[in-house]
């Protein structure tokens, strides 16, 4: 079977991508160093030596720029779930999509910001009410999109069968706990993230069905 190599982007597309990434990098640096509310669009544009008008060609506003790194991770994860082998059970597909997707995701993120800067941006989102509200809205939309992917994989009517939404809700809760533990720890390595993810997913069954007291 022949494989085709995707065409390389043209110079125009490469320049647009470079400008987008430079604006995003500048925005993240400013948000994490002086705060989201204190940072203006003009400051972000000036840091890259472009006009405010150019900024708005790439982002609808500060909020979109602040959540852009998160958007990259979410988009990659949804596509990762969609690409999992059909024989995998739903929870296993979710598990493998996140565990196997971290390498390529890390490369995409680190081309813009270091893992440490990414973690700092995550803290800014959690501590800024307007960003946290937007983050929660996006999280709900993402869970719905992933549940729909699972329903399609399993041939289910998502409106009649609650299992896709239940599975994604449980998985999402595990990932939120994992991310919070990761960003508050001292080890920002991918191996630590994988280890935490695997450990917490392994604990879902016992946590839901077993007793928690010592000796039970």
Can you describe what each PLM-predicted range is?
Residues 1-34, 38-50, 67:
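Basic, helix-initiating cap at the start of DNA-binding domains
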Residues 1-4, 148, 152, 180-216:
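C-terminal peripheral helix-coil segments that are non-catalytic and often amphipathic
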Residues 19, 73, 98, 138-142, ...:
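Hydrophobic/aromatic residues within well-ordered alpha-helical segments
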Residues 23, 61-66, 76-77:
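Short amphipathic alpha-helical segment with a characteristic S/N-K-E followed by hydrophobic residues
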Residues 51-59:
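Short hydrophobic/aromatic patch on the recognition helix
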Residues 68, 75-121:
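Hydrophobic alpha-helical connector segments
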Residues 128, 140-167:
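Hydrophobic alpha-helical bundle segments that form small-molecule/ligand-binding pockets
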Residues 136, 156-201:
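Hydrophobic/aromatic-rich alpha-helical bundle segments in the mid-to-C-terminal region
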């Amino acid at each position: 079977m022949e494989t085709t190599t995707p065409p390389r982007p043209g110079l125009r597309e490469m320049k647009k991508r470079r400008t987008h990434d430079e604006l995003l990098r500048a925005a993240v640096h400013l948000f994490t160093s002086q705060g989201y509310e204190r940072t203006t669009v003009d400051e972000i544009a000036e840091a890259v030596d472009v006009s405010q008008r150019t900024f708005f060609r790439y982002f609808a506003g500060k909020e979109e720029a602040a959540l852009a790194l998160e958007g990259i991770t979410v988009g990659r994860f949804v596509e990762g779930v969609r690409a999992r082998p059909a024989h995998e059970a739903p929870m296993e597909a979710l598990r493998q999509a996140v565990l196997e997707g971290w390498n390529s995701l890390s490369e995409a993120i680190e081309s813009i910001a270091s893992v440490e800067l990414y973690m700092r941006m995550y803290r800014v989102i959690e501590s800024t009410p307007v960003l946290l509200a937007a983050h929660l809205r996006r999280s709900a939309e993402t869970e719905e999109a992933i549940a729909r992917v699972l329903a399609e994989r399993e041939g289910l009517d998502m409106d009649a069968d609650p299992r896709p939404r239940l599975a994604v809700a449980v998985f999402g809760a595990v990932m939120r706990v994992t991310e919070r533990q990761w960003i508050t720890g001292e080890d920002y390595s991918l191996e630590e993230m994988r280890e935490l993810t695997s450990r917490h997913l392994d604990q879902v069954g016992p946590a839901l069905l077993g007793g928690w007291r010592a000796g039970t």
